[in-house]
Amino acid sequence: MNPSRCRIIAIGKVRKSWVQDGIELYRKRLPGLTIVELRDSNPEKEAESIRQTLRRDEWPVMLMEQGETLTSINFSERLRSLGSQRLAFVIGGADGLTAELKALAHWKLSLSPMTFPHELARLLLIEQLFRAQAILQGSPYHRA
């Protein structure tokens, strides 16, 4: 997994300092990973902002409650199987993603069957990206 081939596109700003601290901790451990914050608005405007931000060479990975749930090991294997494909992990705002955006997904992913605030989902995702890299590199970080 190459962090420079991944972007996180998220609606809204992280307002809680402890969440931001966690995100920054993992961002430093994943050099090259980009996080794009888009302004929160109504779902249609958010969808338009996301569509405009997605690059043609990226596969959108939409994070949603109804997406595929994977173990950390399965997640790392999936990332490895995608090789050099550029990925854009998309986290919607408080109202989630529109049906139109969900239809653009190359992969629909759920971090859990539970619902989390979108800023916490960002922290969980970036930690799982770091964990996936650690698993693929044989690092002792993942000890399941």
Curated annotation (Swiss-Prot):
Organism: Synechococcus sp. (strain CC9311)
Keyword line: Cytoplasm, Methyltransferase, rRNA processing, S-adenosyl-L-methionine, Transferase
Compartments where located: Cytoplasm
Quaternary structure, from the entry: Homodimer.
Family membership: Belongs to the RNA methyltransferase RlmH family.
InterPro entries: Alpha/beta_knot_MTases (IPR029028), RlmH-like (IPR003742), tRNA_m1G_MTases_N (IPR029026)
Keyword Magnesium: no
Its EC number(s): 2.1.1.177
Binding site for S-adenosyl-L-methionine: G92, L111, S112, P113, M114, T115, F116
SUPFAM superfamilies: alpha/beta knot
CDD domains (alphabetical): RlmH-like
Its job: Specifically methylates the pseudouridine at position 1915 (m3Psi1915) in 23S rRNA.
Record bears the keyword Ubl conjugation: no
Domain of life according to the entry: Bacteria
Protein name: Ribosomal RNA large subunit methyltransferase H
A single cellular component GO annotation: cytoplasm
An annotated Gene Ontology molecular function: rRNA (pseudouridine-N3-)-methyltransferase activity
Primary localization class, coarse: cytoplasm
Catalytic activities: pseudouridine(1915) in 23S rRNA + S-adenosyl-L-methionine = N(3)-methylpseudouridine(1915) in 23S rRNA + S-adenosyl-L-homocysteine + H(+)
S-S bridge residues: none
